[in-house]
């Protein structure tokens, strides 16, 4: 009897089932094409779709328009990245170099920065990748220049892209060091004195692969590298070695790497 009671008491602790719910356009989602999903500290789910930004409170959707001088921006070149920074501020960024910030007091997205006309006039998509670092900088990247918009000072720093390749992903290691993935490989770089400096790293420099996704695990100082049709690589900063796990998913394209339960 004691054994049975013991098992029954433990049962609630052992069961941790997840609840999943399908939501789609019939529930109010503005479009079936969803490019990014974020969850803020209030529990709202934010979806960047082909129509704009949707917020879901668990019951219903609310759609937000992205406006520039009275014109709604709903083309694919303006709907590319949806980020939450370390201060829980929501940002939407497009390949045309326009940056929107969500204003919770006015409950709307406000255009806070856009690239100068002389930068965008000859390039329909002047930005190949955007990234928010822990120094409050929004990176707007192409193969020639990096435009760093500081969200606190509203100042923009233009620096030369020393890699001279289209950037596909960035992972920040510490205050000044970054891993930068491109369509040709991966690079170790330092952002210092208003310039990007490439640092030698033979185990990465000699890895000619197209990078889709980077994830840096700080406790182990390991970089997980998701590639296009080459599976996963792992670079250990402690041993300076690059390896492929036994289950490397060779010939598979890796588009996202996320830690479990995070």
Q: PLM features: what roles do these ranges have?
A:
Residues 1-262:
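Carboxylate-rich, polar loop motifs that coordinate divalent cations or form catalytic acidic clusters
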